Structure formats: structure tokens, C-alpha cells
């Protein structure tokens, strides 16, 4: 019984030693506060990953399906600063786009941005009807051309913002419609594979 009480007391004391750290989004997402995390040592905050939605950052309720992942890379005092690690669309949102008699076209592309960041970008488009394999290939080729071109032209921050805000997907939809009417195009996932040496 005494041992159990000691364990409870020790746990309480350990919790008392913990401090709350404020987590901030990367500067190119406005550097806004995105959460709090407890730790008894600032080193334990390093590399923690926080998931937020684009709605949390912008206040735009139509962006609740866009999930963003930020990783802590620096701690100063009670402030924890993050870098972008990836994004993905909520599964429920993707399911809502794919209906009977539609065609989902997926593309996965490994790219390097103008400033040397390596990313895996997953795009998708939804055609209004069942389409031919040749049309799928043509739309996938459009995805590839647009995403590769953007990677050559844009630095990491601008590429991520254009992807997250739907600008790249809008270009894919516009060009893809020349092959077949599309219900929607989306960048559904981004993963950071590597950073330039000096980053």
C-alpha cells in the first residue's frame, strides 16, 4: 500500500516539474500559435510533431480537411518553433469525392524544389465518369508536368503554400479538363524526404 502511495506521489511530483511549451507554426504559415505541449526538459520537446488543420491556422471553415504536420526543431524559453514535415487530406473528404461511376486518377511524384528540398507529392483527380486508360494516362502526365514545373520554379515554402492552398490542384484541374471533364483535382499528400545540407 505504501509503495503504491509512493508511486502516486512520485508521478505527481514528476508532473509538477513539467512546464508547458507554446508551439508555433513555421513563419510561412504566419508563425501563429498552434498548440501547447508539456515536458520536464526542453530537449524532450525537440522533434515532437503536432497535427493541425489549415482551418486552425486561417480560420477558414472550408479548410478543415487539410491536415498539416509540423515538427519542433528549436526551443527558446517556453517557445517551441517548428518546420513543415508534411500534409494530407482527411480520408473522409477523399471518400466524399469518389462516387459511383467516377474515375479516380492518382499520381505519385518525387521532386526537388528550386532550393533543394526533396518532397514526395501525391496528387489525385476525379473524372465525372468512367474514362479510358489512355485518358487516365494523359491526365496523370498533366499532373506530372505541372508539379515538376512548379518544383523547378518555386522554392520549398512557395511550393508548399501553392499546394496547400489549392493553386497547383486548380492548374491540374484546368488542364485536365481538356482531356475529360473533372469533378476535382487535389494535392492529397506531401511528405518531406530531405532538406538541403545548409537548411
UniProtKB/Swiss-Prot annotation:
It holds the Pfam family Ribosomal_S3Ae. The keyword Lipoprotein does not apply. InterPro entries: Ribosomal_eS1, Ribosomal_eS1_arc, Ribosomal_eS1_CS. SMART domains: Ribosomal_S3Ae. One of its GO terms (biological process) is translation. GO terms for molecular function: structural constituent of ribosome. GO terms for cellular component: ribonucleoprotein complex; ribosome. The keyword Ribonucleoprotein applies. Keywords: Ribonucleoprotein, Ribosomal protein. PANTHER family: 40S RIBOSOMAL PROTEIN S3A. NCBIfam families: PRK04057.1. Belongs to the eukaryotic ribosomal protein eS1 family. This is Small ribosomal subunit protein eS1. It comes from Pyrococcus horikoshii (strain ATCC 700860 / DSM 12428 / JCM 9974 / NBRC 100139 / OT-3). The lineage of its organism: Archaea, Methanobacteriati, Methanobacteriota, Thermococci, Thermococcales.
